[in-house]
Each structure stands twice: as structure tokens, then as C-alpha cells.
Design a protein with these regions (language model features):
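Beta-strand-enriched cores of mature, soluble protein domains
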Residues: 22-163
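Bacterial N-terminal signal peptides
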Residues: 8-18
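Bacterial N-terminal signal peptides that target proteins for export
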Residues: 1-8
């Protein structure tokens, strides 16, 4: 039991953090929806790491957003492909800079995706407290739609009301 002190400290920290409202939580927020198109350039960063059963890759992302979100994004994506057709995964971080429905600043999106034998699962969320400028306090989730090779986004988000 003498090594349980760190467990208690961690539980105490989690309890304090979960009950202490952040600055963004104290302010009134408004739910919004944004949509538009984007172009993306994906470029391999080095050679793929191939081994029995899987291939790992690293890529740079360069995006141009249009519509309710006008701006650019740069990021890094890590991928894993398998020998099973339609099964793979990726994680990515991208820093978006631009104007979201008239409010300028930047924020970071975190992507987590898997595909199991052709069945995709994708989660794209705003990294907490990553907003800057007029986008401080931004939270939200983005969805990507690909139709006939064209990319578009749907972005449900909240922001503190403008002062």
C-alpha cells in the first residue's frame, strides 16, 4: 500500500480538474455550424516502414479551407496499413489558421481514424484550449465528406459569445 500515494494524488488532481470550470466554461457560448470545401495535399515524409503484417507511414498535410472557414492548415499524419484489404488507421494533428464565420485566429484539429474491412470510423476534434485570437475557447467536432474525389467539411462548434 505504500506505493498508492501517486494513485491518490492522481485521483485528487482529476477530481479538482473535473470540478473546476475553465475560463471558456465560465463564459456564455453559442453553438454554431460551419460547412464548405477544402483541398488537401498529402506528401510522404520518408520511406514507408514495411514489416510482416503492416506498413507504417508519415505524411505532411497542407490544406486550403473555403466556405464558412476560410484559411490554411498544416499538419502531420501517421498511418498504418495492414495486409487485410480495407483495414487501416491514421492519426493526425493539423493547425488551422484563418477566419471562422468572421472570427480570425487559429486552432488545432486532432484526427483519429480506423477502417475495419472497409467500415470507416473517424473522429476529428478541436484540441482543448488550442484556439487563439478571436477563436479562444473554441470547441467542436468536424466531419469530412468525400464525394467523387472532392473534399468538404461539416463543423459543429461552440465559441464564447463575442464581447
Amino acid at each position: 500500500m505504500k506505493n498508492c500515494g501517486w494513485v491518490f494524488a492522481l485521483m485528487l488532481l482529476l477530481t479538482i480538474c473535473s470540478t473546476t470550470p475553465s475560463v471558456a466554461q465560465k463564459e456564455k457560448t453559442v453553438a454554431e455550424h460551419a460547412a464548405g470545401a477544402f483541398e488537401v495535399k498529402v506528401e510522404a515524409q520518408g520511406e514507408a516502414d514495411k514489416a510482416e503484417g503492416s506498413t507504417l507511414g508519415r505524411y505532411s498535410l497542407d490544406k486550403q479551407y473555403h466556405g464558412d472557414l476560410e484559411g490554411t492548415a498544416k499538419g502531420t499524419m501517421l498511418t498504418a496499413g495492414t495486409e487485410v484489404k480495407g483495414s487501416a488507421g491514421y492519426v493526425a494533428m493539423e493547425r488551422v489558421a484563418g477566419t471562422l464565420k468572421g472570427r480570425s485566429g487559429s486552432f488545432v484539429l486532432q484526427h483519429t481514424a480506423t477502417m475495419t474491412q472497409g467500415e470507416p470510423h473517424l473522429s476529428i476534434t478541436v484540441v482543448p484550449d488550442s484556439g487563439s485570437g478571436q477563436l479562444v475557447g473554441l470547441t467542436g467536432k468536424m466531419n469530412i465528406i468525400i464525394t467523387a474525389g472532392k473534399h468538404s467539411y461539416e463543423f459543429d462548434y461552440t465559441l464564447p459569445t463575442a464581447q
